[in-house]
């Protein structure tokens, strides 16, 4: 039995590898905007869990005897749920809005095994630093935050601009290792079952 990661995220892969797991990588290609639109103002935690499940669903037919994991993260800032900024301009706009504020990074998890699902969401509070306009511009131009939920990464250049985290730091990187462990336990599996 293997652990299949329905993601192309190098950060999620890195977390699993650092945790002793050699995941099977099966990047999921879903229309996130269409999934969100179909939810009709669902609560933020439901939105990220539904996106995580949609990603995992793309891999279960190919891996019917394995554990399939899907994840999705979005930033809840001032009541708005924000995904990836995609452009330098949008990244700059978001950083100017979020600097000096607290926000919640929501990471939804959907784990499938043996025809059953376990879904849950982790909320971690991020305190963004009072970042200068010059640093915001330089960070956006680096390209690092363009494809990251909330327009930031905890690792790499983004580490300069996060003043504090309250909650699970691995969820901020994209996959809560403690939550994944609890999901595996619900299936009667252990984390160590997947160690290489």
Model-derived regions, located:
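N-terminal beta1-alpha1 ligand-phosphate binding loop
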Residues: 1-21
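Anionic-ligand binding patches
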Residues: 2-4, 41-196
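Cofactor-binding loop segments of dinucleotide-utilizing enzymes, especially the Rossmann-like FAD-
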Residues: 8, 28, 114
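Active-site-proximal loop->helix
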Residues: 18, 37-38
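A local structural micro-motif
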Residues: 23-24, 192
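A short beta-strand-loop structural module common to alpha/beta enzyme folds
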Residues: 24-33
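A short acidic, helix-capping loop that chelates divalent metal ions and anchors anionic groups
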Residues: 32-37, 77-79
């Amino acid at each position: 039995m293997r652990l299949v990661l329905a993601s192309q995220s190098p950060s999620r892969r890195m977390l699993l590898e650092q945790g002793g797991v050699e995941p099977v990588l099966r990047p999921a290609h879903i229309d996130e905007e269409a999934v969100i639109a179909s939810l009709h103002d669902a609560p933020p935690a439901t939105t990220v869990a539904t996106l995580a499940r949609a990603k995992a669903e793309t891999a279960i037919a190919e891996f019917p005897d394995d554990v399939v994991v899907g994840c999705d993260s979005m930033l809840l800032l001032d009541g708005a749920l924000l995904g990836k900024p995609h452009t330098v301009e949008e990244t700059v706009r978001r950083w100017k809005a979020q600097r000096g504020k607290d926000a919640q990074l929501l990471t939804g998890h959907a784990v499938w095994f043996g025809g059953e699902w376990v879904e849950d969401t982790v909320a971690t509070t991020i305190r963004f630093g009072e970042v200068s306009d010059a640093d915001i511009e330089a960070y956006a131009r680096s390209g690092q935050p363009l494809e990251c939920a909330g327009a930031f990464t905890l690792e790499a250049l983004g580490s300069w601009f996060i003043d504090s985290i309250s909650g699970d730091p691995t969820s901020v990187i994209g996959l809560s290792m403690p939550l994944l462990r609890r999901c595996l336990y619900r299936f009667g599996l252990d984390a160590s079952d997947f160690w290489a």
